[in-house]
Design a protein with these regions (language model features):
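Non-catalytic alpha/beta scaffold blocks inside enzyme catalytic domains
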Residues: 1-131
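Long, compositionally biased stretches
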Residues: 45, 130-152
Length: 152
């Protein structure tokens, strides 16, 4: 955010909105939102970010996508789609893939959430050794999570 606030970043893409303090010092976030040439938000609900965004794309809820999430205690769990997407809604990873394709920074591929998670586990040490198989039904702690998270 500081780089956007200083004007060295031209665009911000938010995958969720929320109160400004969610993204850092509110004054810096506000200045960043004012200084960027383009602000895009993917979300389900209105927020201070949506009020400033140049483009608001329809987001999806956890019930409309497959993937994983990591809770605040460092436990990674699977989420499974139980609702069908409607209209032009897309999962965040699809939006980012399409944006990357259009900007020429990502090759045209059709990844899936499991492959994306596999790449994350290869690239980020805290997720090393985790896979959809090791997550199972109860999830698993990332490296460095506390013992109470590891036990469940």
């Amino acid at each position: 955010m500081p780089s956007a606030a200083e004007g060295t970043i031209k665009a911000l893409v938010f995958l969720r909105g929320g109160p400004l303090d969610l993204f850092g010092e509110p004054a810096i976030v506000q200045r960043a939102l004012e200084n960027v040439e383009l602000c895009v938000l993917v979300d389900l609900v209105e927020s201070p970010v949506s009020q400033r965004a140049d483009w608001v794309l329809p987001g999806v809820s956890f019930a409309e996508k497959d993937g994983t999430f990591t809770n605040s205690q460092g436990r990674v769990q699977r989420i499974r789609k139980v609702l069908t997407l409607r209209g032009d809604t897309r999962e965040e990873w699809r939006i980012l893939q399409e944006l990357g394709n259009h900007l020429g920074v990502l090759p045209a591929r059709d990844p899936d959430p499991e492959r994306i998670f596999s790449r994350l586990a290869q690239a980020v040490p805290a997720f090393s050794g985790l896979s959809y198989t090791t997550l199972g039904e109860l999830g698993a702690p990332i490296a460095g999570a506390t013992a109470d998270v590891a036990v469940g």
